[in-house]
Amino acid sequence: MNEPLETIPALPTPPAPPPAPVITENLVSPVVTYTLMVISIIVYILQAGTQQFLGYDIPALLGMKVNDLIIQGQLWRLLTPMFLHGSILHIGFNMYALIIIGSELERRFGHWRFLLLYFLGSFGGNVFSFLLSPNASLGASTAIFGLLGAEMVFFYQNRKLFGAGARRALQNVITVAAINFLIGLSPGIDNWGHLGGLVAGLIFTWFGGPKLNVEGLYPLLNVVDERGLTDQLLGAGLVVLFFATLAAMKIMGLGPF
């Protein structure tokens, strides 16, 4: 007589894997980046046009960094050089850097903070050039180096969020800055302006740049910026105070400048 087959209990159904997290980040379009590029191109066309038809580069005469004229009170020359360029190659290189670096930074910094950063980088760079270089100068590279400094601090302060990607990005930015400083050793390039822009970007972003955190209930998560307008104004105020003090010392003949 056949024995009944032993019944094998069914294995329990494995639990469903947890849903993948849905992470949203409030990114903006790089409107300011493209606006700055358009303004710079228009100004360069005016430079070329006045040079061609009048024999003088009127925008450069009115706005480039000239130490003696700044000492005489033309303080706008600590900002306006960022919209002026000396050649097609000069503006082409700077606008390419602005698009590559600026468009990504603006997405996370927001329009207002990015614009503030750009102007502060230019201000810091032109002040350092005013202090340490007797040569006239112009170009957006002061502001571009401000963006590089900001990018360094951004990835460093948010390294836990971005993980290994932050380390790679930080290494890339430092490498790009180092290469450009080496290029800046060539005659006719204002490395002091580059250094000042970098320092301004570092200071502003350390105190006022985005410091990101993840909030929400899993799996719906949001990337939020812990810093607000007060932090941005603090960072900007420190940059202005530091560089304006140095410029004032130079103008009044104080200190080692």
Each model region followed by its residue ranges:
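Specific transmembrane alpha-helix
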Residues: 124-127, 135-158, 195-208
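N-terminal TM1-TM2 helical hairpin plus the immediately adjacent luminal interfacial "cap"
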Residues: 29-141, 186-191
